[in-house]
Amino acid sequence: MQSTGVIDRFLDIFARYIDSGFGLISGDVGFLASSLIVIDVTLAFLFWTWGEGEDVLARLVKKTLHVGFFAFLLTNWNALAKIIYLSFSGLGLKATGAGGAEDLLHPGRIAQVGLDAGRPLLDQASALAGPVGLFTNFAEIAVLLLAWAIVLLAFFIIAIQIFVTLIEFKLVTLAGFILVPFGLFGRTAFLAERVLGNVMATGVKVLVLAIIIGIGSTIFDEFVQ
C-alpha cells in the first residue's frame, strides 16, 4: 500500500489547501452576503411602501424565508457539500454492494485493488516461466502479462479519475461558497443557481464513478479469491 498511498497523500494535501480557503474567504463572503441582503431588503421595502393593495406581511414572511434559507446554506456550506458527496458516493457503492462511501475518499485503495487483482496473473506467468518455459509457454506468458497490464492500467486510471473528481468537487464547492450569496439578490440569483447546479452535476459524476468502482471491485475481489 506504500506505493499507492502517495495518491492519497497528494489528495490530502490538495484537500487541506482547498478546505483552508473556506476559512480565509469566509469574512469576505459574509460581507458580500450582508451587503446584498441590505440592498435587497431596502429595495423590497421601497416597493412595498409605494405599492398599493399588496399583502406586506406575506411578502415579509416570504423574504425572511428566502434570506434564512441562503443564510443556512452559507453557514453550513462546507458540511452540506460533504454530505452531498458522501450521499452520492454511498448510493453508488450501495447499489453494487461494495464498501462504504469513505473508501471512495482514498483513491490509493482503488489502485491497491488493481495490484491485488493482477497479482494472480503475474504469479501464473512467473510459474510458467523458467529456463525453458519462457520459450515453450511464450504465448501464454505474453497473454497473462498483457492481461495484468490492462487490469493494472484500468484501476490506476480509475484511481486518477477519482482523484481529479474529488479535487473538482472541492473546487466547485469553494467557488459555490463565493457565488451563493448572489442568490440573496434577485438580479444576480442566476449565479447562485448555476453553481448549485454544478455541485449537483459533480455529485452525479461521483455517483457514476462509485458504481463503476463498486462493480469492478466486486468482480476482481472474487477473481483474487
Functional labels for PLM-detected ranges:
Residues 1-36, 46, 55, 89:
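Binding/recognition "hotspot" determinant
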Residues 12, 16, 59, 63, ...:
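Short amphipathic alpha-helical coupling elements at transmembrane boundaries
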Residues 16, 20-27, 51-59, 132-137, ...:
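Membrane-helix interfacial "entry" motifs
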Residues 31-43, 143-151:
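Hydrophobic alpha-helical transmembrane segments
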Residues 41-64, 150-153, 157-190:
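Hydrophobic transmembrane alpha-helix segments characteristic of membrane transport
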Residues 54-73, 77, 193-205:
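Alpha-helical transmembrane segments and their helix-start/interface "positive-inside/aromatic belt" motifs
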Residues 73-171, 211-225:
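Non-cytosolic segments of integral membrane proteins
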Residues 144, 170-225:
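Hydrophobic alpha-helical transmembrane segments and adjacent short intramembrane/lumenal linkers
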